[in-house]
Regions:
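Short acidic alpha-helix that forms the nucleotide-activated donor recognition element
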Residues: 26-37, 60
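Nucleotide-activated donor-binding/catalytic signature segment of Leloir-type glycosyltransferases, i.e.
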Residues: 1-29
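A charged, aromatic-enriched C-terminal amphipathic alpha-helix characteristic of glycosyltransferases
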Residues: 91-101, 105-140
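Short alpha-helical segment that forms part of, or immediately flanks, the ligand-binding pocket
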Residues: 31, 53-63, 77-78
Length: 140
């Protein structure tokens, strides 16, 4: 949040206690927060040659994912396009009534929904734990 202090402060003023900025956490605590979340937020990448592995962890939860894309070449976009509980919002579109209406509609549509892991695994078979382990073993 250090790079986004002003935006985070504005969001906190609007959302009050609904916005949590815990700072750095041990993995167990971060995992517990993720498990309690209704929607997971993915921050877009401006570099088209870097894929955040966290996204696949998010897919594995089966939870809705809100992705905030910074550019059209974000490498996560093809994967998010396959995920039925994803919404991608683009920075270039700004915060307009249309964008906020779209977000509001989506939040109501996905409320309480979660994909079973088996369904997510069918969407991304090459990224299941078994397939990744097979690939590691192939190279050892």
């Amino acid at each position: 949040w250090e790079r986004f202090t002003e935006a985070a402060d504005t969001a906190a003023a609007t959302l009050s206690k609904r916005l949590v900025r815990p700072g750095l956490l041990p993995p167990e605590e971060a995992g517990a927060l993720e498990n309690r979340a209704d929607v997971l937020v993915s921050l877009g990448n401006a570099y088209d040659n870097q894929m955040p592995s966290k996204l696949f962890g998010y897919f594995a939860t089966g939870k809705p994912i809100l992705h905030l894309a910074t550019c059209d070449t974000d490498p996560t976009l093809p994967y998010l396009a396959c995920y039925p509980l994803a919404l991608v919002l683009y920075a270039k579109d700004g915060v307009t009534p249309g964008v906020t209406a779209r977000l509001n509609r989506w939040l109501h549509e996905v409320r309480g929904r979660q994909l079973p892991f088996a369904e997510t695994a069918q969407l991304y078979p090459e990224f299941t734990p078994e397939k990744v382990a097979e690939e590691f073993l192939r190279w050892i």
